[in-house]
Amino acid sequence: MKILALETSAKAVSAAVVENGKVLCSGYQDTGLTHSRTLMPIVEHILKNADLTMADMDAIAVAAGPGSFTGIRIGVSAAKGLAFAVAKPAIGVSTLAAMARNVAFADGLVICAMDARRSQIYNAVFEAKDGHLTRLTEDRAIALADLAEEMKADPRPKTIVGDGARLCFDFLQNANVPCRLAPPHLVMQNAMSVALEAEVLAADGALTSAQELQPVYLRPAQAERLRQK
């Protein structure tokens, strides 16, 4: 099963194609340009270089959230459009579950962290053992202080991954919670991990139509919060 995956949840943008656990091609860009300018050229570039077309894909996956509101909207909209154009199913992947796959080899707890501002992070915690991941919490927005209290009670080794990893690491260290950062080349979210997580979901039947694919924000955008006041 060939899966094209898109990752636009933070500053960087990436795309990858995976087949049966093997990465066939991938592209990554972190140049400060908007995702609306860079995503589709990356998709076109990797497919062309791998001598693939959209018709060769069996499903389109995307990091559906949480993450940057604008980034998630762009990624989900692109995935919906691509899936609809070639009449293929879509797979919405948790940004946090995907990034946990970066360090599934690191036995212990995997703490996924994205900066959600206001002293909070988007977070999920997994247990990694022998390359397998077990989810311990739901995706959530949590105060760093509350996360520190949770982690103090758990003696297992802790690896932090995600674009908010440094923020989380510094806070936990100051709170006397032993932890470590994921290696630099694995700390950030990427489309390859989105594709690998999508394979697991597809095997469980978690396919959806382009029309049904929806972003997952966890909390309202700033503009919506202001309208509600």
At which residue positions do the language-model features occur?
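N-terminal beta-alpha supersecondary unit
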Residues: M1-A64, M188
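Glycine-rich phosphate-binding/hydrolytic loop that grips phosphoryl groups
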Residues: P184-P215
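DPxDG-like acidic metal-binding loop motif
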Residues: A61-A90, T95
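Phosphate-handling active-site elements
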Residues: K48-A55, F84-V93, F105, A206
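Surface "functional belts" at beta-alpha junctions
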Residues: K22, T34, P89-M188, Y217, ...
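Stable alpha-helical structural segments in soluble proteins, enriched in small hydrophobic residues
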Residues: I46-A50, A85, V103, A191-A202
